[in-house]
Amino acid sequence: MTQTENKVVIFLGPPGAGKGTQAERLAQEQSLTKISTGDILRDHVARGTELGQQVKPILDAGHLVPDEILIALIRDKLAGMRPVRVIFDGFPRTGAQAEALDALLEDLGAPVTAVPLLEVPDQVLIDRIVERGNQAQARGEAVRSDDNEETARRRQQVYREQTQPLIDYYAGRGQLYTVNGVGSLDEVYDRILKGMQ
């Protein structure tokens, strides 16, 4: 696939699975734009925008942001992008979001190319999230409001309840493949690439 062709990759997996890290590397190595709704929303919160003030309590509680807000953010990000070469990290999270994204991508002539699902045991996920917060604090950086054990466990539960239909959706379309998300960054990355072939 050349860099002038459309490529749409959707990373799935629970919070703390390493989606952001792996998506960043894949984006850099394959000239893709990484779209993280979480990063976009956190930026709005940090800047104190109207949207940021609207979603801050939702994010702090570990709940999912309403679909209409996320779809509008994605539509805005993809406007004018040709070819469409993107990685979605943290979106879609529900079947309704997947259907809305598919409709948007269909309008752009850029169907989903691959959907790697990173699988990591729950306790490993919790440990990673708490450690991420500890490391940020040790470096004197701002700690994400959701990088604590209680919120992390709630996010895992929300993920399981709301994302399973999404996994079924992409599996049914033959676009999903499972990746063992435990191991070194290079090991996991190599598994992702192998699954995309």
Curated annotation (Swiss-Prot):
The keyword Oxidoreductase does not apply. SUPFAM superfamilies: P-loop containing nucleoside triphosphate hydrolases. ATP binds at G16, A17, G18, K19, G20, T21, R132, G183. It comes from the Bacteria. AMP binds at T37, R42, H63, L64, V65, G90, F91, P92, R93, Q97, R144, R155. The keyword Hydrolase does not apply. Its EC number is 2.7.4.3. It is found in: Cytoplasm. Transmembrane segments: none annotated. Coiled coil: none annotated. It catalyses: AMP + ATP = 2 ADP. Residues 36-65 are annotated as: NMP. InterPro entries: Adenyl_kin_sub, Adenylat/UMP-CMP_kin, Adenylat_kinase_CS, P-loop_NTPase. Pathway: Purine metabolism; AMP biosynthesis via salvage pathway; AMP from ADP: step 1/1. One of its GO terms (cellular component) is cytoplasm. One of its GO terms (molecular function) is ATP binding. Residues 131-147 are annotated as: LID. Keywords: ATP-binding, Cytoplasm, Kinase, Nucleotide biosynthesis, Nucleotide-binding, Transferase. One of its GO terms (biological process) is AMP salvage. Monomer. Belongs to the adenylate kinase family. Catalyzes the reversible transfer of the terminal phosphate group between ATP and AMP. Plays an important role in cellular energy homeostasis and in adenine nucleotide metabolism. NCBIfam families: adk, PRK00279.1-3, PRK14527.1, PRK14531.1, PRK14532.1. Consists of three domains, a large central CORE domain and two small peripheral domains, NMPbind and LID, which undergo movements during catalysis. The LID domain closes over the site of phosphoryl transfer upon ATP binding. Assembling and dissambling the active center during each catalytic cycle provides an effective means to prevent ATP hydrolysis. This is Adenylate kinase. It comes from Deinococcus deserti (strain DSM 17065 / CIP 109153 / LMG 22923 / VCD115). The lineage of its organism: Bacteria, Thermotogati, Deinococcota, Deinococci, Deinococcales. The gene is adk.
